Each structure stands twice: as structure tokens, then as C-alpha cells.
Amino acid sequence: MNSSAQAGVGSGALSHVYIHHPSLRCNIPESNGLFYDDANRLLICTTSSQVFSWETSPFNPDVPPSVDSISEGPILSIRFSLDKKAIAVQRSDCEIQLFNRETKQILNHKCKAGSESILGFFWSDSPLCDLAIVKTSGMDLFACDSMLNSLRLVETKKANVNWYIYTHETRLVLLASGLQCKTFNGFQLSTAGVVRLPRFEMTMARSESNSKPILSAGDLHLVTVYGRIYCLQVDREAMLLHLYRFYRDAVVQQGSLPIYSSKLSVNVVDNLLLVHQIDAKVVIIYDLFVDSRAPVSAPLPLLWRGYQVSETSSQAVNKEIESSESSTSNENIVMYEDGWTFLVPDLILDQTNKVLWKIHLDLEAISASSSDRTSLLEFLQRRKLEANKAKQLCLGIARAIILERRPATQVTQAIDVLVTAYSYSVKAGTYKEIKNENATASTPTPGASPDSERHRQSGSNIDEEVEMNLSSGSQENMFCADEQQESQLSSPAISPDELYKFVFTSVEEMMVEESEYLVAIITEFLRSISAEKLKVDLNIYVMTIKLLAYSKRFAELSLFTTNKIIEPSKEVAFQLLDSGRQNIRVRKLGLDMLRQLSLHHDYISSLVQDGYYLEALRYAQKHKVTSVRSSMFLEAAFASNDMQHLAAILRVLSELIPGFKETSEYYTFYGLLNDTSSSVAV
Amino acid sequence: MASMSSGDESLRLCMFDLRRGQTEGQELEKILFFYPADLDFSTQLSVIGLSEGLITFTRLFSPEAACEVIEAERHSHVFYEAEPDIWMVMVVEKNKETGAIWRIDALRRVLKEVHSLFVMFHGSIRALIEKEPTGGLTRSLLYPFITDYLSTFQIWSLSEDCCCEFFVGKKLQLPTFRETLRERGTVQMLTLARDTAVEVQSLVQVLDSCAGSLRCHSMILFQDLLVSTTLSADDTVDLFTFAVMRLTSKALSSDTSSWSYLRKGPGSSEISSRSNLAPVGSIDSLHSRNGNNMHHVIRPLQNDKWTKGKDGFLITDIWGLETGGSPDSAIPTIWLQQTQERMYLLAYQHKSLTLLLLMPTNAIVNGDLSISAVKQQVIEDASLRILKIEENISRGWGGENAYHIKGYRYLVVDNDTKVSRSSPSGKVTTLAKESLLALNKLREEVDSEKSRAKGQEKDMEICIRAKNNVWVIARVTRGKELYMALEKGSDTLLDTTDAVGRFSNRYCSGAFLMD
């Protein structure tokens, strides 16, 4: 990715990542705590006796909070149960209270004071337990009865725990131990059961003073991208962000990213890793899909935008309302201020202003700043959050590279990317369709694409990230995200038909003079879809014929047709006949095609048109075609002034068409025949 | 066999210009070429004089198309007006015992072929004469060219017709009735599966753009079959003919095995000396008049001159050595009929796949293009694809007898595209001599019908049962021709037309409708 592209622009208004108005604002007076429940995606605001909660997914700032009353007391943390029937509140380091929202019953859970203390808790949807409480002595797993009357301890995982991290997205809990807190016990509490990870250590560079740095919970980030689970670890001494990927039975370090700020946080948007370099106030985007650990784009500030920009170019429109720093608005936003908490995947909680922001990617800006079109297309084809925008950008790029007359090899690569991505999404789509029948409600196909009918048949609309469940037996990705149900996505994949419709037809007019170049591109396109065994709108063949005929490349036109690169069809045949007005060979190709397609009527009519009326009649006789007007043959023969032929035709028609001798046509031409030459006998 | 020693009277081949030597004493001027070259001038002039007389006489009745053939008692005279007022005449001896039974049109096509090839390499004869009115340049090019061409007949016959092997080295074999199921002046195509065809076309696009913005032409052959071309039908035929003669993998490998015989015959070593014995005036004076370029006569059809280089490109020293002068001067050049453009010819070979690349010469003169850069580009952009395509085609290729259709001995010609397909020669030889003779006779009839139609498309359907119970069939329709021999004695006419109909539907997409 090219970073110099923006250097020239240089304006502070340029960004690849932005947050925009309106935010979700919790203007509850006397609130004393702001929490985020990642399992239920709830923003929770507490007062001394009330709990306000907002749904953050889908992100809607206007949604009113729901209100629950709880007894007064300190709140260290608060989480709704997964069925939202109960609220669990950690009151102290030895007490957790559970409130049943319906029955208003309260259940208290206390641990042995003194010997151990509670570090935190979370709800689980594993079959084994419903609630996990992490203590300094290990993790207790509890099952609740349906009425939440009691907690039953089902299992204890003994370990010395300094601190822990958990995200519901990954269902992964990492328990830190050791002097440097860099030794980890990990468990995944997924719907398939509880899996214990092998114990592992994280890398920590020694500081210059040779003191051993201690890892804190804030230095670790669990993220999910492309259905893979990663743990990111900040190593401040080395100024590196280490990546660990979790497999079923192994934790493997997979490279490191450089960091430019001692304060660091991460978000994940649309499977892209956003690394906030807080001191530098910039975001760097990484796409972990590719092996390269190079950033997708140059570091740019996070921007605040007044309103959503959609189809228009971001740089042009938003300059006046964008602000990288703050205070232009009533919201008084200070970027990367201390009160910000970054919530994985894509939320920022501003504790000071009590607002929640959702992070957005500006795909247009990213593509505008990239010069390598092939990798850009690959990048865009992996986007799902704004699939439609990604798709439109891809189409735009495809059009642009053709109009810019990029070398055919470059265009070929681009086409290959798009076709392969489509083919892949078709294949993946069918897989998921099967799965949806017995699993979750299938995702509705939003914003039906112009070609939705075809898409639905092939099932390509469904996002390509096929979830790999633990139960699905995939050896590699045992861990995976649970995002799928709510991903209201269509794929940015572009079908060959759409490529034809939105790329080739739109460039055709502008490139008539360069039909040779366009033919080269279309050939590559046909090769690409043929390699993927896909079909395309047959109008592309009509276009190919026009272009080849225009540049008088009849030899190739002939090869394209006889080798069936141009698939035979009635439309194609008619185009050949039409283009064949300049070249009899091409016209014959059209005639041959009509015959091969057994389009008897058209074949016979075209033959007569070309003056081969005897051949036409012979063919009609052989194939018993009576739909062609008999007068056509007669008129053709009469026009050629060959009375013998006329006589022969009259005789054949009398045999071919019952009752022909009674028609007025017969009399007319029989009369003409007798007038002209009495010597010819019928 | 239809062979003859070059020394006897069985073959005369001459080319002359009616616009030259019209005053007495200057008759020799009109002779451009005569075979055998060592025949005395009076005999040469008598052959040409007779031909000229016949042409002048027949033109009285048919100014557009004069004499085509004269059948004498012992000889056939075949006429071909190669260019306006430039005539080629072939006189062949009739001899039933040696099997010297010809179809006149097949012989005329030999004349046509050698002329087309000559024009492809040297440009039109008229243009040469106009450039150098003494005719010395033209003669010095024609003599080795046609002699080289005639010598190639021996090699061809060796590979195609094993019966003639005994005579190789001593004799020339002109196409006899045994070759009635083939059509000179057409190309034979390889049938491709769609996905391979798409790959090929994609390769063609790559090749065509190897010289940057300058569009090249290309032709691809697999063994002796055409895979793709971007040239017009006529140019395709000429270049294809040459490639099959000299460039394809088969041509390269068969040269070495059979050439040793031919050296004993009217081989290359003698030709140059003999061409110097050319009848007109003193060659030496011509040389001095025309300067240095006369010393090096390019002989494009010279055999055994092409080898495959390390980089896959075919190398030849026919056009000179690469070391001398400008590096591009040694690159072969040809003329395209359709565009009248002079093109550099590059040949690249990978196993059975031969790729010919044509680039306009003026682009190089202008400095827009360098051959070595193009070569580099081909290797970089195309060599992987070439590898893959060669593999694909080889895998799907049915071998020598791929286009054999059981029970049929056939020839299909498409005159529009100049493409033909026929039973493999090995299968044709299983036909009885009578069958071949009958078919040859039938073709002769069709030829004369066609020539009477004067370029208009004829529609014909002929089925004949010959003496040995063979059915010989000719079907001509809208520019396509089908010839067939069916040696199943008991078949009725109805069965026969059915059989032809089935063949047509199955293999010719129903092009030949049978009543």
C-alpha cells in the first residue's frame, strides 16, 4: 500500500477511520458508573439504585434505555445474563449479587473472605456452566437453575491468578500468573464445551535497567478476524505488538507489529485490525488475512464526522465538517482523551462525556490512497460490513483500470481477483445455506443486489466467512467468532454478469476506437470465468463479435466462433449475420450457428435473404418446416428470373404444404410461370 | 509412382512475363524461370512460345480467363496466371503405368502455392521486375526459390506417402490421384476444447501485445495443425504452408533424418551453381550492375537451415548471420498480402507447439521496437502459458489418427476460411486404387463445373458407384466441399446418402444437406 499518496494531500481532514455523530449518549443524572456488557452488547449506566441499559447492536443512538431497579451498593462490575433474565453485580472482591429481573429475587454469592478474592465474572453459554467467577485461586464454574434460585458449583479450575481477560466474542478466558504475569492458562467456554488451552508464556523484552516488566491486563487484546482468534500483546520495551494465534491445541506467535506509542489500543472493524497509537493520535490499519504484516494504509488520525457520508467522496464533501481535534461541536470531543475505553470489536466508550462511539472505516479513502489495484481489489473483496460500498468501489476500479488503458496483464490480474472471489463466495455460500437450515435463522439478504435472483440461486449473497464451529471438526480453527447471526451482510462479490453490465458495457462506448484492447480484456475475462467454470450473460459475446468485426479481425472472429469461445445462441447468431454484412465469411458463421441451434425458421429465412432459396427449400423439406412463408421462396425465385427454379419450387411446395395448390399464391405464381415461359412444365 | 527424374522430359516448369521480350531477338528476356534449368534455350523457348501462343489465342474468346489446361497426347500443359501477364506453365508427361495420373487443379495449386510463397518472402514478381527492369534480380531469386520448393516435394512425400520412399532422392513426386483426398492451399486445424481455446486466445492476446503498443500478428501450430491465427485466410495459408515445411517440430526433426538422401539429388549445393547458369545474358554483368546485394541471394525455402536455440526461438542463417551489421538484419522477413506490410518473423517452439510472431519492420526501422526486447517479453509473459497450453493440447490430442472416422474416407474443404480436414493419409492408403481413381475423376468433374461457374458458388450433389462397388461422393454447397469414398459394396444409394448425412450432421454441423 502506498503511503506517499496522502503525503501530498497532507490535509488534516484525511482519514481512513472515523466516528460520526450522533453518538449513543447516556445522559442519566446522578449516574455513578458506566459499563459495557460485551456478551449482550449492552451499554450499562448505573445510579445508586437503578440500572439503565442500551442495546448497542444494532447501533442506534435514539433507542431508549431499559431500566431495572437493584438494591443500593457499590458496583464493581455488572453483566446481564445471556438470556437477560438476570443481572449479576459484583459488589466487592468477595461478593456477587444476582437479580432476577422478573421475580425480583436476589441471590448472593460470597467467596471465602481473606483467602481469596473475586477478580471478576462472566456468563457463559457452554453446556457445562452458566456463570464463571474468576478468583485469585482459580476459576469456579457454576450452573444456575432456570428460576435462578441457586448456583451450583460444577467445576473448579485451580490456578494462581493475578488478573484475567475474557471476551464473549472469543469465549476465551486467559488467566495470568507468574511474577511478570506473562504465563497464561487459557480456557474456551464455548457451546461445544470447555476446552483447556496448553499453558503458554508471552514474550517480554527486558528493559535497559534490567528490571523485569510486568504485563497488565490492559496490554492484552483478544480479537477475532476472519474467524480466527488472536491475542495481541503490547511489549513496551521492544515497542512491538506481538500476535498470537490460537489453534485447537496450540498457541503460535505469528509475527509482530511495530508500535509508535506507549499507549495503545485496538479495535476490529470488518475483520481489519485498527491499532490506535494513542500518543501519536493516529490509527494504523492491518489486514491479517495476508501474510504480509505491512499496514493497509498509512497512519492517519481518527476523525469525527458530523454526519454519515455515503456515496460521495469523503475528502471532497467533509472538509468543513470534519475535525480531527475537537471542540468545533457541541459535543466537545477530544480525540484519544484519557477517558476513552476501546471496546472490542468496534466501539469507543468516552467515560468523561458518557458517550459511546462506533468506529467506521472509510473504504473510499482507503482505496483512494492505494496504488496497487490488485491487492486493493482483494482487500475490498474481503470487506463485508459495507459490502455494497466495497462492491461499488471494485466496479469503479475495474472500470477505471480499463479506461486508463492499464497493461492487459494488470487488468487480467484484477479480473482474476474479482472472478475468483465470486467463485469462492458461491462455493462458500452454498455451504452455509445447508448449515443455516439446522442452525440459526438465516440472515436476510439486505439491499438486494441488482442480480439478486441469480445470487439467491447460487447462494452467493451469504457472507463468505463460513463459521467453523468446534463441532464442525475443523482441525485448524477451533476457536471462532459468534458474530455470524447478526452479520447482516451481503458479499461484495461481483458476478460475471454484473462485471459485464457495470464494467464492460459502460466502457464499451468510450473505447470503440480501442476495440483491440477491449477484446484482449474480454478474452482474459472469458478465460478467467471459464477457469472457474462460471457462466456469463451471453450479451458479452454479442459485444465481442461487434468489437472484432469493428477492427476487422475476422480470422479471430472465426476462431472465437468455431471454437465456441463465443457460445452459440440466437442473439449471437443474429449479431454474426449483422456484422457479416461487411464480410460474407462472418455471415456464414451466423448461418451455420442458426443451423446448429436448429433454429429452422430463422435459418431458412436468412438463406432465402441471401439468395439461397433452393437450399432453403431443400432444408425446409428435409426438416419439415412449414412455418416459413411459401411466397418467400417463390418471390426469391421469381426475382432471380429463373423459371425452372420457380417451377421446381411450386412443385416442392405443393408436396410440402397440404392444400397448397388451392391457395391464391399458387395461382398467382403458376400464372406468372405460364405467362413467362410456356415451355417449362410444372 | 508419379515420379520422374529431373533430367528426363517428364516435367517442365516455367514462368514467363508476357510484357517482356516482345521484339525479335529478345525472346529470352521473357523467361523468368525454367525447370530443368540446364535445358537448352531453344527448347525452353519452344515450350514458352507454345504456351504464349495458346494464351494469346484463347484470350480472343475469353479475355478474363485465358487458357487453363491443354491436354496433348502425351503431356498435360497446366497454365496459371500468377500475376497479370506473368504466367506459370507446368508440362507433365502422362504415363498410366507409372501412376502419373493427375488432377489438373491439384497441379495448378502447386503452381499457385510456390508463387504465393515466393510473394510472401520477396514480394510480387511484377514489383521486382519494375524495381529492376533487367529481370536479373527476379531470376536470381526465382531460380533457387522454385528449385528449393521442388526439392521439398521429396521430403513431403517421404513423410506422407511411404510408398514413394524408394524414389526419394532421385525423383520428384507431384500430387497424383493418390492425394485426391487432400487439398493443397488450405490449412488443417486442430479442434480445441472450449477452455483450451480460451487459454489459447488469451495467449494470442499476450503475444500480440509483446511489442508494447504496437500490435503484432501471431500464428500458433501444434505439430502440423493450426491452432490459432490473427492473419487473413490467404496469409494464414502461406505462412502455414511454410511453417509445416520448415518450422514445425516435425519439420525440424524429419529434416535431419531424410535430408541425407536428398543431398544426392538436386540438392542445395547444386542449386546455387545452377542458378548461375541461368539462361539470360551474363549473370556477372547483372551482379556488377546491382551492387553488393546481389551476392547474397536469400533462399527462404532452403532446407535444414533452422535449428532451435537455447531460448526456445528458432534460429536460421538464411537471412544472414546475426553478427554482421545491425542485429536485426538477420531476422527473417515476410510480406503480408492483405496489408502489404513487411513483417519480421519470429518463431518460438516448445515441444510440439510452434508460435510465429510477426512484427511490422518499419516499427523497428523507426526504433520503436527491438527484436531482443520482444523475445524477452515473450519469454517473460508467455512462456508459462505456452507450457500449460502445450500440456493441455497434448493431453487431449488423439494422435495421427485423431480425425479418422471409421468407415469413411473423406475430405472436407471450407473455401471461405481455406480450411480442410481429411482422413489421415495412413487410412487413405487402405483404399483400392480403383476407388482413388474414381474419386480423382469425380473431383476433376467437380473442378470443371466449378471453373465454369466462374466464382459463383455452386451447389452440387453427386454420388457415383464405381466399378469396384465403391461409392464416391461429392457434395458442394455454399463454399463448402465434401468428397468421400465409401467402400462398402452392398450399400444402396439411400444407405449411402444416409451415411453422408450422418457424417455431415455429426462432423460438419449439418453443413451438407443430403436429399
Curated annotation (Swiss-Prot), chain B:
Q: Which GO terms describe its cellular component?
A: Mon1-Ccz1 complex
Give the principal location in a single coarse category. other
- Record has Metal-binding as a keyword: no
- Entry's Gene Ontology molecular function annotations: guanyl-nucleotide exchange factor activity
Q: Where are the transmembrane segments?
A: none
Q: Which InterPro entries match?
A: Ccz1 (IPR013176), CCZ1/INTU/HSP4_longin_1 (IPR043987)
Keywords (A to Z) from UniProt: Endosome, Guanine-nucleotide releasing factor
Localization terms from the record: Endosome; Prevacuolar compartment
Q: Name one GO biological process term.
A: vesicle-mediated transport
Q: Name one Pfam family in it.
A: Intu_longin_1
Tell me how this protein assembles. Answer: Interacts with MON1.
Family affiliation? Belongs to the CCZ1 family.
Q: What does this protein do?
A: Plays an important role in membrane trafficking through the secretory apparatus. In complex with MON1, acts as a guanine exchange factor (GEF) for RABG3F of the Rab7 protein family. Promotes the exchange of GDP to GTP, converting RABG3F from an inactive GDP-bound form into an active GTP-bound form. The RABG3F active form is involved in protein trafficking from prevacuolar compartments (PVCs) to vacuoles. May serve as a linker between Rab5 and Rab7 protein families in PVCs and mediate PVC maturation.
This chain's protein is named Vacuolar fusion protein CCZ1 homolog A
Native species: Arabidopsis thaliana (Mouse-ear cress)
